[in-house]
Amino acid sequence: MTIMIKKSDFLAIPSEEYKGILSLRYQVFKQRLEWDLVVENNLESDEYDNSNAEYIYACDDTENVSGCWRLLPTTGDYMLKSVFPELLGQQSAPKDPNIVELSRFAVGKNSSKINNSASEITMKLFEAIYKHAVSQGITEYVTVTSTAIERFLKRIKVPCHRIGDKEIHVLGDTKSVVLSMPINEQFKKAVLN
């Protein structure tokens, strides 16, 4: 199977690919993880799917979306700042044109694993966010994520550290943390072979 990585902003994304992203997010977040989300027609979207959003996503040979990220600038409204500010403790929410929030990371359940650790799609998506950061002058990503993803990042050696109050919070049924992922040589080595 050939995997194509694509990037688009909200206003330019082809409608079928956008629908594929929302369908995958529904499958992962609503069906698999059972998050309490408002969905319509088996598609998951929220108020952050707007003109500020960018998407990096993977499509297979048949143009099915098999993985995705949503990227939001920290200079406007974004999830950590507006939905989960309690995770920051006494720290202010990042507000910097060179810091971007990653959210809604999803990979299809049928992605085959390589080296018993990560799917090819997952690794290509991490490579893509690294390359995107370098090309756009992004120095850091921030994300509200699960402790399982935190462990995964450490296993594949993507640099990350907790920010905010640095505590584990239970969001729904998910143990969650806020992470910073600096764009540096360690990130490059972790995702580029």
UniProtKB/Swiss-Prot annotation:
From the UniProt record, give one GO term of the biological process aspect. bioluminescence
Q: Does the keyword S-adenosyl-L-methionine apply?
A: yes
The UniProt record lists the EC number as: 2.3.1.184
Listed under catalytic activity are: a fatty acyl-[ACP] + S-adenosyl-L-methionine = an N-acyl-L-homoserine lactone + S-methyl-5'-thioadenosine + holo-[ACP] + H(+)
Q: Which UniProt keywords apply?
A: Autoinducer synthesis, Luminescence, Quorum sensing, S-adenosyl-L-methionine, Transferase
GO molecular-function annotation terms? Answer: N-acyl homoserine lactone synthase activity
Q: Which PANTHER family match?
A: ACYL-HOMOSERINE-LACTONE SYNTHASE (PTHR39322), ISOVALERYL-HOMOSERINE LACTONE SYNTHASE (PTHR39322:SF1)
Per the entry, what this protein does is:
Required for the synthesis of OHHL (N-(3-oxohexanoyl)-L-homoserine lactone) also known as VAI or N-(beta-ketocaproyl)homoserine lactone or 3-oxo-N-(tetrahydro-2-oxo-3-furanyl)-hexanamide, an autoinducer molecule which binds to LuxR and thus acts in bioluminescence regulation.
What the record says about family reads: Belongs to the autoinducer synthase family.
Q: What is this protein called?
A: Acyl-homoserine-lactone synthase
- Species the sequence originates in: Aliivibrio fischeri
